[in-house]
């Protein structure tokens, strides 16, 4: 998104604050705050990683003010939802009803004077950016939103058309990617239990030693043929699983760096802030997920090597096969115990963000 589009978006946002706001309007405003917060955070993280300029206290103030504004706005929305649910009377100072609205509408209308978060946005736009422009000796990225510009309307029309086309293409790509990931996850999860059963079967068969005894019997030949054909299917499934785990590990490492950098930016602005607990909790969740992902990768790579030997008919000693089968069996026990812990203790991560939520937030 270009600077001009950001200016137009913020201008329209602030100009729309002159009347009463419904729950739908508050939801849109909250999403806008989230978008602005993510754009500002990504810009500072990119500049810091690219060594374009050192992180200043003004940038830390930007991010801290935006985070506080977002939290206050979401708290305000939650309070309004509680009032609406309990059907308690609300004073006219905190609530106004639009006379032109439909009488059948049951939405609660809120006076914009209670939206203190947007006052923080205004102060952030008018104060911190002007200070940053003076300190760097260049125009601010976010200019004064109320200053009129004669060429904005014509340029905004062209930019909006290009932006809509590009957004539609990106949205289509995201939808197709999401559908493929859902299909792939469903395919892998459907065969995951069968893979565990197959690991247990081969491990027990290797202990019994039916591969060496009665090698010419009909049952032995059928079992060998079944193992060889089934290994081809398991090989594809495990390859997809290893690929997903490798991508997840990359995302976790990237997210961990962003969380650390954002924590350093905010702590440099407010060293005694209690916000450090939130970032420490996120880092702990990420590191725990990295360990779990690494163990999953190790087990799946072992299984990939094991099934590859079966498919390619490589000459490997029985000792190596037994070791690979034993590791696969141990990993199947680890997976079952991990799933059991998550099912019996659903509140183990109560109050904390999951690693997937953190990855999506910093994507």
UniProtKB/Swiss-Prot annotation:
Bias (Low complexity) ranges: 97-114
Span list, region Disordered: 71-114, 128-157
Subcellular location: Peroxisome membrane
Protein's name in the database: Peroxin-36
Keywords: Membrane, Peroxisome, Peroxisome biogenesis, Transmembrane, Transmembrane helix
Keyword Membrane: yes
Peroxisomal side: 214-232
Gene Ontology annotations of biological process type: peroxisome organization
Further comment: Has strong predicted structural homology with PEX16 proteins, despite the absence of primary sequence homology.
Function: Controls peroxisome morphology and abundance under conditions of peroxisome proliferation such as oleate and methanol media. Has additional function(s), which is not present in its functional homologs such as Saccharomyces cerevisea PEX34 or human PEX16.
Transmembrane segments: 194-213, 233-250
Topological domains annotated Cytoplasmic: 1-193, 251-363
Organism, as annotated: Komagataella phaffii (strain GS115 / ATCC 20864) (Yeast)
KW Transmembrane (keyword) present: yes
Record lineage: Eukaryota, Fungi, Dikarya, Ascomycota, Saccharomycotina
A GO cellular component entry from the record: peroxisomal membrane
Bilayer topology: Multi-pass membrane protein
Effect of disrupting the coding gene: Induces pexophagy during peroxisome proliferation conditions. Leads to a delay in peroxisome formation and a serious growth defect in carbon sources requiring peroxisome biogenesis, with an extended lag phase and slow doubling time, at least in methanol medium. Results in less numerous, clustered, and bigger oleate-induced peroxisomes and more numerous, clustered, and smaller methanol-induced peroxisomes.
């Amino acid at each position: 998104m270009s600077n001009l589009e950001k200016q137009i978006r913020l201008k329209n946002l602030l100009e729309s604050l002159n009347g009463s706001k419904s729950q739908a309007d508050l939801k849109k405003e909250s999403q806008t705050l989230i978008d602005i917060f993510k754009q500002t955070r990504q810009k500072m993280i990119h500049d810091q990683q690219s060594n374009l300029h050192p992180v200043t206290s003004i940038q830390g103030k930007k991010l801290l003010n935006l985070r506080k504004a977002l939290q206050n706005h979401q708290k305000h929305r939650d309070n309004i939802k509680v009032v609406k649910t309990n059907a308690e009377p609300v004073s006219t100072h905190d609530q106004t009803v639009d006379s032109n609205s439909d009488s059948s509408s049951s939405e609660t209308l809120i006076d914009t004077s209670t939206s203190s978060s947007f006052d923080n946005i205004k102060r952030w736009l008018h104060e911190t950016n002007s200070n940053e422009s003076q300190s760097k000796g260049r125009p601010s990225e976010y200019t004064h939103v109320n200053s009129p510009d004669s060429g904005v309307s014509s340029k905004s029309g062209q930019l909006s058309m290009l932006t809509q086309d590009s957004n539609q293409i990106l949205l289509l790509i995201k939808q197709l990617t999401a559908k493929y990931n859902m299909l792939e996850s469903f395919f892998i999860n459907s065969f995951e239990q069968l893979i565990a059963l197959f690991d247990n079967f081969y491990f027990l068969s290797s202990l019994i030693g039916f591969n060496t005894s009665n090698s010419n019997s009909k049952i032995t030949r059928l079992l060998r043929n079944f193992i060889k054909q089934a290994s081809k299917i398991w090989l594809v499934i495990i390859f997809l699983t290893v690929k997903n785990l490798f991508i997840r590990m990359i995302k976790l490492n990237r997210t961990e760096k962003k969380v650390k950098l954002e924590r350093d930016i905010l702590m440099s602005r407010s060293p005694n802030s209690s916000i450090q607990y939130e970032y420490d909790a996120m880092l702990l969740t990420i590191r725990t997920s990295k360990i779990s992902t690494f163990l999953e990768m190790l087990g799946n790579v072992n299984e990939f090597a094991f099934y590859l030997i079966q498919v390619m008919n490589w000459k490997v000693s029985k000792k190596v096969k037994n070791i690979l089968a034993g590791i696969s069996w141990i990993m199947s026990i680890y997976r079952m115990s991990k799933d059991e812990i998550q099912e019996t203790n659903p509140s183990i991560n109560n109050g904390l963000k999951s690693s997937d939520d953190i990855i999506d937030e910093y994507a």
